[in-house]
Amino acid sequence: MTKGILGKKVGMTQVFTDNGELVPVTVIDVTPNVVMQIKTVENDGYSAVQLGFDDKREVLSNKPEQGHAAKANTTPKRFIGEIRDAELGDIKVGDEVKADVFAEGETVDVTGTTKGHGYQGNIHKDNQSRGPMAHGSRYHRRPGSLGAIINRVFKGMKLPGRMGGKTVTMQHLQVVKVDLDNNVLLIKGNVPGANKSYVTIKNSVKANTKKSLSKQHNK
């Protein structure tokens, strides 16, 4: 079973541990999420909890969005996401999910959309090296050879194209601090996306896998 919360990336800062160690952290605003809908296997084919984050003015929302929010007795939301196979417990539509869903020291997976860089060449996009810059060279920043005697381009070739703007998950990040008063999570390291971009935080999958494997090994 999983648990999670939706949030907005604020920026990065640093904190000091009790040992005096400096730890870079990402500040994530996790204003209480509202449970918009509970999906079940019987009705929807899978189990999930739908959360809503960041209020949206009704004048900017359409009728279906307003009606969906009204069922949860809340306002329309800018960011709606699902937590699959969530720990339901006594949770019901309209309840709030707060920052204390996670504890300090827990590991989480954070999903966000990376910064978009537009159309870029191989040197910037794929970290390739440039050619000689002398007058006699005819190869400076172009892509290299695509292979010998082929009349097509193989899939996966590193060529110029759009860079960034992709959904990326950073795995196994540690929750350094849970600030319930300010509705903030401090997560060690960086998370994908620009400041003010939306992120989804779930408990770490690999952490659970490692624990289960260690238990099997000990048996």
Curated annotation (Swiss-Prot):
GO terms for molecular function: rRNA binding; structural constituent of ribosome. GO terms for biological process: translation. Residues 113-142 are annotated as: Disordered. Keywords: Ribonucleoprotein, Ribosomal protein, RNA-binding, rRNA-binding. It comes from the Bacteria. Disulfide bonds: none annotated. One of its GO terms (cellular component) is cytosolic large ribosomal subunit. SUPFAM superfamilies: Translation proteins. Belongs to the universal ribosomal protein uL3 family. HAMAP family: Ribosomal_uL3_B (MF_01325_B). Part of the 50S ribosomal subunit. Forms a cluster with proteins L14 and L19. One of the primary rRNA binding proteins, it binds directly near the 3'-end of the 23S rRNA, where it nucleates assembly of the 50S subunit. This is Large ribosomal subunit protein uL3. It comes from Limosilactobacillus reuteri (strain DSM 20016) (Lactobacillus reuteri). The lineage of its organism: Bacteria, Bacillati, Bacillota, Bacilli, Lactobacillales.
